[in-house]
Amino acid sequence: NIEEILNSTHKGVEASKIISKSNYGEILELCRQTAGCYIHSTDPRKTFEVTEQERLEFWEKLYAEPGFGIWQGNFSDMLTDRTANALMSAFLAEKIRSRVNDPAVAERLIPKDHGFGTRRVPQETGYYETFNRDNVHLVDINENPLREIIESGVRTDSSDIPFDVLIYATGFDAITGAFERIDIEGLGAKKLREFWQDGPVTYLGVLVADFPNMFICMGPHSGLGNYTRTAEYSVEWVSDLIEYVVENQKARVNTTEAGMDEWTSHVMSLGEGLLANEIGSWMTGVNRNLADKQKPKIMRYSGGHPAYREFCDKVKEEGYRNIVCT
């Protein structure tokens, strides 16, 4: 009962806890079955298999709903077909124009260097309306680059902009960045950061040949999707492997070069044709602050998490194929 919960009565709070947990199992099982481990499944239809009216009605429905449905529950070719993606991006551009009063500001807010869904999707409520406020001003640093931080704020090419508070949002060095910050050294004094210089190579996104007992959870080449759900499986799989090693009185876990090459090739093959892998973003390992991370690379397993689990489970069933325990 909403009134009870809003009134914060003991009874209402306790009832809300019971109600919210009543379908946990169903939700978790649904997430296990979808490619991205969300509650949404890709629509099997393609963008141009429906009429324009049907397409617009479908998109309006997705746009009005909360959550990742517009990204994870869209037409099946939305992230692989350029024309389909451009059409979806144009639909969203019109939504931005309708919500932002100043046409010039609206145009600045419409992405020009990537299509919808090829970078992390913003889940917002009232974000675009923020730019209709008198005390909010948008500066496009592509048109007016930042030059330096000064005592009163920031300096751009054209002016000094004063601030009371400056919040840094410079991005993050994702996928491989955390591993490269550590001086990880394997057999034969092999450095991981040097070994991955041209892109990561792994076995299942878990092991790297000649780096024994280094277990990676949620790093490159692992199952892409809802990290809370995918991380759970990754940790459980690695835990089972460690338990297997202990039970068999082994001390070192390594993978074979052949297994690593096979898996990496599989990841590369699955990533071909995915529009997101052509775009510079954290998901493709691009960090504009680092000179050696300017070009997008295929960093993630994109075959869907159910397929990833099936592959890893089969490796386990076969006595940990391509994994050497000594």
Question: Residue ranges of each PLM-predicted region?
Answer:
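N-terminal FAD-binding dinucleotide-binding subdomain shared by FAD-dependent oxidases/monooxygenases
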Residues: 1-326
